[in-house]
Amino acid sequence: MKDISQIFKSDIKIEDVKQENGIFCCMNDHFVSGDNQKYMKMYDWMSFFYDFGEKWIGKLKYGNGIDRLRTELMSRLEWKNAISVLYVSIGTGADLRYLPQGIDLKTIDLVGADISMGMLKRCKKQWQKKTNLTLVQCPAEELPFADNTFDIVFHNGGINFFNDKALAMSEMLRVAKPGSKLLIADETADFVETQYKKSVFSKSYFEGKTVDLNAIEQCIPASVAEKKTELFWNNKFYGITFRKSN
């Protein structure tokens, strides 16, 4: 990125922002509570084996299902070379392997945001030499970026259990450029019930939890255009695309 300071809000002085391992830390303790805090801790410890689990255990259990899912989700966005992209809840950056053919990641000004420092560190280790990547630790409910900054904003995995889903949606829209297309995706209630509540690694984190897709859809402001909800991977995942009004 040519000038990293340009992506941040005008009241944020880049030289004053704390960094850890080259990752900008913009955490507001107000949002590090409840489910946000619980799942931040979960992903911090899962970060050590997350990619291994998806590559090998996921492959054994689901075949190429996860690969097809990520490819389909990424195809719903309007990718071009030399654009600016915000990936909210970037995790280890797994979706970056599934961009449409012809897209050169090194031409893209890519910003990844996540509440989990563990996942961000894994992401940096895997992608810093392959991309033009800036990583920021922050809650989705308070993105530290300037209004109308990114050509693409997308989120895959997490919003089901954000503390304030509507605020996170509002923030993603705020930082997207007018006319740009956004994607929000996460697991359906069926997948949470049959996978996360059964897995020895995650069941304690999802006890008593459920997913209300209708409620999540209602968190998207009425001002958006071209809103569309799709189900993927045999109804295990949903994806909602919409366009920010000009």
Show the residue positions of the predicted features.
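N-terminal accessory segments
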Residues: 1-27
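Conserved class I S-adenosyl-L-methionine
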Residues: 18-80, 94-98, 119-122, 126, ...
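Class I SAM-dependent methyltransferase SAM/SAH-binding core
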Residues: 84-142
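Short beta->alpha hinge that forms the Motif I/post-I loop of the SAM-binding pocket
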Residues: 114-115, 164, 187
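A short acidic, Gly/Pro-enriched loop at the edge of an enzyme's catalytic core
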Residues: 141-152
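A short SAM/SAH-binding and catalytic strip from SAM-dependent methyltransferases
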Residues: 151-164
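A short glycine-rich, Lys/Arg-flanked "PGG" loop and its adjoining helix->strand segment in the class I
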Residues: 166-178
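C-terminal alpha-helical "lid/dimerization" subdomain adjacent to the S-adenosyl-L-methionine
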Residues: 181-241
